[in-house]
Amino acid sequence: MDIRTQPLAAAPAPVLRADYAPPVWQVPEIALEFDLDPARTQVTGRLSVVRAGDGPLRLDGDGLTADSVMVDGVAADWAMDGDQLVVDLPGNAHLVEIRVTIAPEANTQLMGLYASDGLLCTQCEAEGFRRIMFFPDRPDVLARYAVRLVADRARYPVLLSNGDHVDSGTLPDGRHYADWRDPFPKPSYLFALVAGDLAVNRDSFVTGSGKVVELGIWVREHDLGRTGHAMHALKTAMAWDERVYGREYDLGVFNIVAVSDFNFGAMENKGLNIFNSRYVLADPDTATDQDYDAVATVVAHEYFHNWSGNRVTCRDWFQLSLKEGFTVFRDQQYSADQGSAAVKRIEDVRVLRAAQFPEDGGPLAHPIRPDSYIEISNFYTATIYNKGAEVIRMMHTMLGEAAFRAGSDLYFDRHDGTAATCEDFVAAMEDASGHDLGLFRLWYRQAGTPRVHAALDFDAPGGRARLRLQQVVPATPGQPDKQAMPMPLRIALFGEVSGTKLLPEQTVMLDGAHQEILFEGIGERPVLSINRGFSAPVTIESDRSAADLAFLSAHDDDPFARYEAMQQLMVDTLVDDVATGNADLAPVIAAVKATLADPALEPAFVAEAVLLPFEAYLGDQMPVVDPQAVTRAWDRLRGALGAELIADWRGVYAGMAAGGNSLEAAGRGMRRLRGVALGYIVASGAADGPALAKAQYEAAGTMTDRQTALTALAMTASAERDAAFAAFHARYADNALVLDKWFQTQALAPRSDTIDVVERLARHPDFVMTNPNRLRSLVGAFAVNQRAFHDPSGRGYRFLGDMVVAIDRINPQTAAKLVPPLGRWSRFDAARGAMMRAELERVLGTEGLSKDVFEQLSKSLG
């Protein structure tokens, strides 16, 4: 089916930012009562509504039928207009009471109220509350919630909701109740409840003003011992937010609940955060060092939302980056303060380049403040979150720490208790700093990753260097013509002979398509270090030679720039090898050797610096992606690095064993570098490689060492590989989170038979279609494995298409997140592109597609 020629009469209508209108009715107070049962939950809502404009009361619903509707205690006339319940109200203030019945255990979408592993829990962002109760389900309607939960005490002994617990008691027939009150107005997407048999890790935090906050992390009894790290992270984040942003917690209780089935990573519901269990549970036997970091980051992120998202929320969903971009920036700052800021910056940029840059360069490109959507859940993207954070970071760089803090204080003071816009945030920054951010607003309006070309000329007799910058913002869907965007570029010059910085670092504001900067008093040939610290989310193109990049990888005093020089040297070499098959690998090998030998570098940084770029990122550097050529070049360089430096890798592997099982930063860094060394030893083809990895697996005292060994073995065809995977499954068969690693490691394996393995795993008894974590670990991981997904047979495309269709019937939101890898069809060679496009068309022709998947498919086809 070609959507260019076939009519789309049933296509859902888009929602437009330009059509925003304030709500006609506000709901300052709502009382909810839940009679909880997995098969049949009765919900009663009492809405105090106040007129704010002209028109009837319209309440959103999704799959709901009203059992009764009363206005001011009297049965009322009402009608359904699509999914909206409409009531004509004569006056300006009324009490509307509505009763509905819902079935949580039948809710496989995991939006609204649903059942998960014996619990009842909610997910309401973005539009899940309308699956619970008829309500103006939009973020600019803020209400104070009073909630009563009633349930069977034996089955659901713990009853939690937002705010403060105010009462509880027993009822006849073995039932009980709990009453919760949230004194702070909040939008419906922040409502939450959890009911179940849970154990709690309790602690407390004393705020700067002396208030004692009760903290609770609620999990299954057998998981209680794995919550200590999350609790420590929560208390650390609370103290950090007071110190860095002046934000103090406002309720008397803060609860976190871990659930097994969850579409997102976590949710910042006021006072009752609900988390995917993978971001709560951690101990050395089941969680890698990376998992520990993820738990700390996500706990902090959701806590920080209490101010940047809850106390000040979004006017409409087009403003989503207002809360998410700002909060990601805040959690990045926090994580950088807890460990190595350099390594954290490298990790953040790697994620941006792997997820957001391709999004910005494909059919799903959108600004951080979009102009339209069909299904808002499709805009919980790397652009909104990660690029949004980079836009905030640029403001921080341009204004400076003090002015940025003044701007954030003003923003919170002005808009506390209201629904704000991205414009409100920028205006607060302008007003507090006196800095004109007029042109900077282009970052909110324009999609696409700017490309900046930098050329440095040196006039030796005159002692001058001239830097010429040229910016291009590529066309994206719906935006063919772009303006140049202002950006801060941190720049330094290093002497080629002295190896030292020739001038202090400068922050250059590139605010046009072309710009020249003159440097005086330059006594030797300068080497350009640009976009230091990744000060702007752009692609830099320069005339720096391999020798220049190798020089910077050894001498640049900005850790990110040093890492970036090594990465660019690798990328240039690999791109050359893709084209010629005979690139000179010696400069890369020498640069890696020098980095390994530098005693001044922390092991965690070295581990990042010597890793090859992802194959997918390498493909992004090419006009047309040839996956097989990329794989050949990548394998050649990886093998050469392993073989030529085998003695170095063995030395590193032995030396880094001193890190042991320590969870301190030094031990974690040593484990990371030791794992990288093991990977290169195995890639070298050394006869003892598989045996070395298997020995590490068997002796491992941490999941990090065990997972590293398993990953190294995954690329081999060896008896050791088969034995290790069998042993891993046997050991962790009853731990769903760890078993996700078993699936994911095989799906990501750089092997020619990975498609066979993945198809077999999709039939494995432990593959559960209803669990988003399991789907992401197998299907999602496979789709980003460039060499396996793009198997020339096209089997990878068919597998993903079949999965999207099957999952869409269960969980449309998760299904839609799997479409983008197929949507990049125009970037690949003709044969692959045709197969990918055909698969998109086949899936689009499926009857009964959700609007979530329809939007992704239709945009991907163009």
Region annotations inferred by a language model:
Residues 1-42, 114-119, 123, 130, ...:
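N-terminal, polar/Ser/Thr-rich
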Residues 35, 54-56, 61-116, 137, ...:
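A surface-exposed beta-strand-loop module
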Residues 46-64, 134-137, 143-152, 423, ...:
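Surface-exposed beta-strand/loop patches in extracellular or lumenal glycoproteins
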Residues 65-71, 436-439, 449-531, 642, ...:
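Beta-strand-rich binding/interaction modules
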Residues 99-202, 440, 558-562:
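Extended, low-hydrophobicity, Ser/Thr/Pro/Gly-biased non-transmembrane segments
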Residues 102-109, 474-475, 534-540:
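Short acidic/polar inter-strand loop motif in beta-rich domains
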Residues 180, 208-462, 466-467:
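Hydrophobic alpha-helical and helix-loop surface patches within well-folded domains
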Residues 354, 381, 520-862:
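Long, ordered, helix-rich scaffold segments
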